[in-house]
């Protein structure tokens, strides 16, 4: 979803093109059936985006990053802790189509099923009206489409496509076909090392190939025609070989600088892919070797059975063809030249403002076509890569509180930079996007910093990548002292030691921290010392008291482990305040815990019927079995109430509300019956701390 440029553009895709040109909107009426696209191209009025500043869950939309056929993507910032995500919002005019709203569910489900590091992560979603959205990881980089239009180096192309193949192989192994692969949906991000790291995006029209799912409506074409396999545009069944065909088109485009078919218009593109053989890549760009040409043309075979049997086979063929390409090129190049030209690609530079910008977060800087992707004919011999600074190879011992309330554990840190480091040597891996207090044990003394987990490498992935099991963190609140110490280490300079006064634990502080540790082991109510039926005013009061308590602790002389514990407690209090501090978030939090008394307090504090109904649908979608059992209790309670057995009826209502606490009618009936009984209630069970409202 590239950024919409100023001026007129297509209302569906946000791009400028003629009225008859093919529009990359994901849903089109089948021109073979005489249909028209919906919506048809219309001018885009450039104005202040009405969604900027709007809150989606815990995130506020800061600015729009890109716009595409199904929706727009915004930079989102957490309202309390400032963490950044990408928020994908469905276009308002498309919310009337249930099949498109369903694709938001499908995208989140598909990505969750696959769980591969080369696929963009989706953290949360809300498919309820009026604004369905997805919460995704924020990527710093640019789409592959930023570099199409000129032939690129074979080594760089194969490196990128191999990572795409890895992602698709994981998807196909779970029966998921992407169905809309194109350079816009392949994102290159910055990672440590030289090679661009690939993220595959937009599984919104992915389909479970072997599931009993409703087929696409008759007369509707789903995908992008320039990259669509013949069987897909003809409405036949598709499998992973349709994705393989799209990768063949992308490989053709990257190596030659143009698409295999340049026909204008949706119908012309579809017919070309269905009937016409593509021109040999070497006829477009002679530098394409015969080996690579053979692989591409086989991937572009009209019949699926004539292509490679799997993405893995295609990946292997690319690697073999690249090796042959290097050998052939070496015979045509003076000794030593190619060894430099064909080295592993480096991290991509950002495109200029005139080029397509990354939709999931791009730090766009003035630059040029990256040396990693430029064709060998466009580059000169490059000097050898500079040696890695000695400090970056030195492991830094750290202490980390991995779970709230626990003591810090010692880990090893590597890959140190001003932005963060990679931690390994432990058995527990924290969740992605969680915040952890970290103490760097430097020669100058311990330095404490709050970090956010941005990458998790479990054992299986660690074996594949030849790296230790661990997790990467970025510094969230790095001080000037920390930055200076890291800079000194990276430059190989000794860090000037600061005299340290040995600290002993204050018994009073130790007792307070132990009390806090016990509180933090519970739920949000326990962290803030609240009863489950506390009103919103009490929640805010206890939140302020918790912050003051932690601030007073920080005034003491704390040992590094104690300071790490306080940092972890601050994270825990912040999480509890976010869960209980607003009526909508608290009502959903209470629903998951069966706390109907808390839901009642949210209604008293102004939770609207529309908000409650939206939460109810989300709750039942995730716990569809809950309502059946709850309804049985509600019916039993109704029968007992009619029979005059009010105490027993109240008990049945209570049991039902613990399973389905967002049923407003039953909440009202329960509270009315309590009043009839004069405030008497059934005794709470041992695990229910809730008091009678």
Curated annotation (Swiss-Prot):
Q: Where are the TPR repeats?
A: 630-663
> What SMART domains would the database entry show?
S_TKc
Q: Where is the Protein kinase domain?
A: 59-328
Q: What is its EC number?
A: 2.7.11.1
Q: Keyword annotations for this protein? A: ATP-binding, Kinase, Nucleotide-binding, Phosphoprotein, Serine/threonine-protein kinase, TPR repeat, Transferase
Please give the Pfam families that the UniProt record associates with this protein.
Answer: PilZ (PF07238), Pkinase (PF00069)
Active site positions, chain numbering: 180 (proton acceptor)
Binding sites annotated in the UniProt record for ATP: 65-73, 88
Keyword Cell membrane included in the entry's annotation: no
Q: Which CDD domains match?
A: STKc_PknB_like
Cite the PilZ domain residue spans from the record: 393-491
PTMs? Answer: Autophosphorylated.
Under Gene3D superfamilies, the record lists: Phosphorylase Kinase, domain 1, predicted glycosyltransferase like domains, Transferase(Phosphotransferase) domain 1
* Activity regulation description: May be regulated by calcium or a calmodulin-like protein.
* Gene Ontology MF terms: ATP binding; cyclic-di-GMP binding; protein serine kinase activity; protein serine/threonine kinase activity
Per its database record, what is this protein's job?
A: Plays an essential role in proper timing of early development events.
What family classification does the UniProt entry report for this protein? Belongs to the protein kinase superfamily. Ser/Thr protein kinase family.
What is the official name of this protein in its record? Answer: Serine/threonine-protein kinase Pkn1
Q: Which organism is it from?
A: Myxococcus xanthus
């Amino acid at each position: 979803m590239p950024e919409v440029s100023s001026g007129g553009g297509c209302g569906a895709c946000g791009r400028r093109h003629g009225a008859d040109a093919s529009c990359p909107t994901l849903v089109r009426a089948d021109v073979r059936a005489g249909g028209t696209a919906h919506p048809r191209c219309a001018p885009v009025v450039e104005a202040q985006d009405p969604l900027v500043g709007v809150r989606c869950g815990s995130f506020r939309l800061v600015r729009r990053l890109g716009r595409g056929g199904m929706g727009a993507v915004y930079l989102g910032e957490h309202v309390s802790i400032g963490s950044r995500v990408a928020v994908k919002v469905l276009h308002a005019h498309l919310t009337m189509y249930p099949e498109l709203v369903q694709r938001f569910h499908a995208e989140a489900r598909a990505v969750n099923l696959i769980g591969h590091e080369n696929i963009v992560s989706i953290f949360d979603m809300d498919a309820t009206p009026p604004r369905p959205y997805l919460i995704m990881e924020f990527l710093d980089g640019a789409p592959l489409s930023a570099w199409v239009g000129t032939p690129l180096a074979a080594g760089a192309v194969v490196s990128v496509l191999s990572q795409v193949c890895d992602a698709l192989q994981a998807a196909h192994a779970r029966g998921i076909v992407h169905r809309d692969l194109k350079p816009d949906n392949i994102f290159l991000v910055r990672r440590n090392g030289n090679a661009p790291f690939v993220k595959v995006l937009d599984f919104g029209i992915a389909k479970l190939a072997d599931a009993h799912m409703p087929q696409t409506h008759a007369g509707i074409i789903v995908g992008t025609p320039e990259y669509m396999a013949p069987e897909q545009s003809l409405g036949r069944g598709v499998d992973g070989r349709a994705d393989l065909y799209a990768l063949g088109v992308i490989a053709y485009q990257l190596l030659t600088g143009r698409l295999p078919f340049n026909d204008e218009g949706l119908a012309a593109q579809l017919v070309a892919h269905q009937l016409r053989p593509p021109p040999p890549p070497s006829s477009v760009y002679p530098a394409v070797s015969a080996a690579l040409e053979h692989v591409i043309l086989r991937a572009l075979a009209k019949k699926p059975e004539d292509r490679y049997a799997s993405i893995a086979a295609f990946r292997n063929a690319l690697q073999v063809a690249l090796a042959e390409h290097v050998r052939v090129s070496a015979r045509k190049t003076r000794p030593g030249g190619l060894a430099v030209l064909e080295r592993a690609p480096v991290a991509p530079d950002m495109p200029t403002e005139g080029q397509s910008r990354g939709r999931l977060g791009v730090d766009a800087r003035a630059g040029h076509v990256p040396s990693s992707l430029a064709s060998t004919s466009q580059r000169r011999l490059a000097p050898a890569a500079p040696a890695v600074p000695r400090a970056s190879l030195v492991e830094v011992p750290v202490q980390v509180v991995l779970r709230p309330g626990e003591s810090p554990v010692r880990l090893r840190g590597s890959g140190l930079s001003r932005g963060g480091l990679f931690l390994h040597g432990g058995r527990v891996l924290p969740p992605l996007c969680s915040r952890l207090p970290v103490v760097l044990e430097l020669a100058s003394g311990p330095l404490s910093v709050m970090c956010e987990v941005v990458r998790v490498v479990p054992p299986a992935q660690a074996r594949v990548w030849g790296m230790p099991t661990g997790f990467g963190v970025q510094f969230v609140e790095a001080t000037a002292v920390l930055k200076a110490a890291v800079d000194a280490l990276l430059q190989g300079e000794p860090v000037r030691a600061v005299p340290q006064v040995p600290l002993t634990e204050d018994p009073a502080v130790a007792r307070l921290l132990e009390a806090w540790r016990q509180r933090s082991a519970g739920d949000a109510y326990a962290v803030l010392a609240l009863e489950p039926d506390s009103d919103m005013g009490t929640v805010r009061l206890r939140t302020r008291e918790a912050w003051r308590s932690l601030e007073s602790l920080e005034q003491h002389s704390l040992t590094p482990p104690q300071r790490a514990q306080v940092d972890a407690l601050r994270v825990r209090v912040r999480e509890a305040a976010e869960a209980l501090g607003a009526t909508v978030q608290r009502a959903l939090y209470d629903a998951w815990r069966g706390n109907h008394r808390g839901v009642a307090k949210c209604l008293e504090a102004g939770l609207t019927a529309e908000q409650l109904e939206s939460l109810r649908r989300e709750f039942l979608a995730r716990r569809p079995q809950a309502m059946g059992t709850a309804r049985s209790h509600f019916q039993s309670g109704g029968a007992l109430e009619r029979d005059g057995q009010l105490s027993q009826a109240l008990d049945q209502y209570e049991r039902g509300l613990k399973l389905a606490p967002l049923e407003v009618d039953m909440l009202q009936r329960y509270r009315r019956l309590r009043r009839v009984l004069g405030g008497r209630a059934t005794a709470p069970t041992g695990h229910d701390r809730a008091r009678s409202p």
